[in-house]
Amino acid sequence: MQNCYTLRPDRGKNVTYLIRATFWYGNYDGKNQTPTFDLYIDVNYWATVSSPIYFYEEITYVSQADDIQVCLVNTGNGVPFISALELRPLDDDISPSGLRFLQLHWRYDIGRSLNYSLRYPDDVYDRIWEAKNYKKWIILNTTSAIDLSVNDDEYKYKIPGEVLRTAQGPMNASSPLELWWLSIGQNKWIVYFYFVEIERLTRGQQREFTISMNDNQFRETVSLEYLKPVVVVSTPVNGWNITFSIESTNKSGKPPILNAVEFYTIGDLPNVPTAQDDVKAINDIKAMYHIKRESWQGDPCVPSKYTWDGLTCSYGNPPRIILA
């Protein structure tokens, strides 16, 4: 059984959105037993929800139809619930070409004081930036205004200036910045690195470094200018975990820094929605005859185990309703 929320943004299909589902159980039902259930975006699996504390699942998603369905699927381990559901339009070029479903794992404002987060109105996309300090790194910051008038190709990401005013670097100037995270399973990762030179260097000095990830599956060299943002988006990187190193080049007179970072995995979209003409027709029938069957939520045919009661579907590309 599934319960679905239908989002109808004005911009319609083939548009990039941030979608965030927030959950806070709080023992609202008095059972003191956190339910476990699945979350679907349109006709594809998004995540499994199981947490007694406040948390959220967030994706960057390119809409496949005029409507977007977010469904809570009962898997027999308690009644699904949701505390908030948000949708924000993004620049269509913010995701690497061809990637329609990115699932956020971490988004960090590096060098910021702990117990601090930043979102709208500072971030026009309403991304939530969590403060992160690494004890083995030194903190750098500036009160100067970040130059956000860089070219459109860089600034489609619209990262807030406040996020870029802090950074961290290595304790030892000759050491790289190194981090690793362990994943639950084999994934394809995309990482967004954000940099700004926030230290006024002396004439002739330069901060240049090379980013490498997962045994050089991705590698890129970056040179910074004072107060001008640089965004580096990795190519897809495979692995059970993710490691990266940011190391100064031989001609750099300064150690590497990192201002902010986002980690995503590439989501799978194996299922194709039911033909839109069929969906419109069956929803018109549903409205005309005031049909209130419990199963008539979400996509009529897909996933096949949640096909609406009373319908027969064919499973070509796309699936079609052949009997109602």
Where are the model-predicted features located?
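Compositionally biased, intrinsically disordered or flexible polar/acidic segments
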Residues: M1-S314, R320-A324
